[in-house]
A protein has these predicted regions:
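Carbohydrate-interacting regions of secretory-pathway proteins
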Residues: 1-203
Length: 203
């Protein structure tokens, strides 16, 4: 179906202002997923089941990692600031499952001031930060980013290419990823919160 987008002003109405109007056309794969329901949750909202440190066992019913860098509570997976006495500065938490089929990964994140984290897509990292402060420069220009508020990232993986958007605004049109691998979250600097992590494999 085809059609136009329109804006209407009724007679006698006050001035109405719009801004940041854009439209993103979906590829066939993404459209198929959006019309086929939500994906499977990667995070149960209560524990770190289904996640692990590399070469370690599934964290199972634990509500936090052994070094305290990751914790689960009330629907939020939190990446916590480092405690130098407990472990290394950089950490990565991985799904125990790997993904070879095309998929759509969706999640919400809320960054603390100057926070630096990342989302690993089959092993390759998409930066997830307090973009307004921590960049990188390419992402400082993102108009839709809401500092210290919830933002939504959607990643559509087709083959070895990922289309990544922030609140509907394109971050990466063709981000290169491996053919197979897990999803990961990085702990680098500051506090980062994630929620509503879901992955829908494309038929």
């Amino acid at each position: 179906m085809r059609g136009k987008i329109g804006l209407q002003l009724h007679k006698g109405a006050k001035v109405i202002r719009y801004r940041n109007l854009w439209i993103e056309e979906l590829g066939a794969a993404a459209a198929t997923v959006k019309n086929s329901g939500s994906g499977a949750a990667l995070f149960d909202g209560r524990t770190l089941a289904g996640w692990h440190y590399q070469d370690e066992a599934d964290l199972g019913s634990a509500t936090q990692s052994t070094d305290g860098r990751y914790s689960a509570k009330e629907g939020v997976l939190t990446v916590n600031p480092e405690d130098k006495a407990k472990g290394p500065h950089l950490r990565q938490l991985w799904t125990t499952r790997e993904f070879a089929r095309d998929f759509v990964l969706s999640l919400d994140f809320r960054a603390g001031v100057d926070a630096d984290s990342g989302i690993f897509i089959r092993g390759n990292q998409l930066q997830c930060r307090d973009f307004a402060v921590a960049g990188p420069p390419k992402y400082k220009a993102l108009k839709s980013y809401r500092p210290q508020d919830w933002n939504r990232i959607e990643i559509v993986v087709t083959g070895t290419s990922a289309r990544c958007t922030l609140n509907g605004e394109v971050m990466e049109a063709a981000f290169k990823v491996p053919a197979n691998g897990p999803i990961g979250l990085e702990a680098d600097r500051g506090t980062m919160e994630y929620r509503n992590l879901s992955l829908k494999e494309i038929p």
